[in-house]
Amino acid sequence: MEQLIIPAIIAITIAFFSVYGLTPFVIRVLEKRNITVVDANKKEKTMVARPGGLSIIVGIESSLIILYIFFPISEILAVLLTTFFAFIVGLIDDKKTMSGWFKPVALAFCAAPIILLGAYDSNLAFPLFGTVQIPLLYMALVVFMIPIMGNTINS
């Protein structure tokens, strides 16, 4: 158990400080280049820098890389790649709005690392029926959930 705590603390610390340190820099650069939008959550017409996801993705990816160094398993690599690909789709969508059908399809392809690296467990445990193995259901669930989450986070 102790061997899991130290890598987790290192990953969390790196993620926190990379986001905390990089966010003001990203905001300054975006404001300097006049890449801002009106904040829809304020009564005043306050301008905010966009896209701000760069500092967040650096924090996520850096922590996943640290975890992968300590634990080189396919599940971490799959999440790392899927997150990065989804970030690229979101960045493209921020720069040039994608059509209604294209963004979900592009995000569905981002699920490929999870499926190709087998980073899912196809065993379902039902209290009444016991354990059932349905691999196609899990693959379909992954392909549908990545676009849903991607659209929820980056809408």
Regions found by a protein language model. Name each.
Residues 2-155:
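"…together with the soluble PPM/PP2C metallo-phosphatase catalytic core" -> "…together
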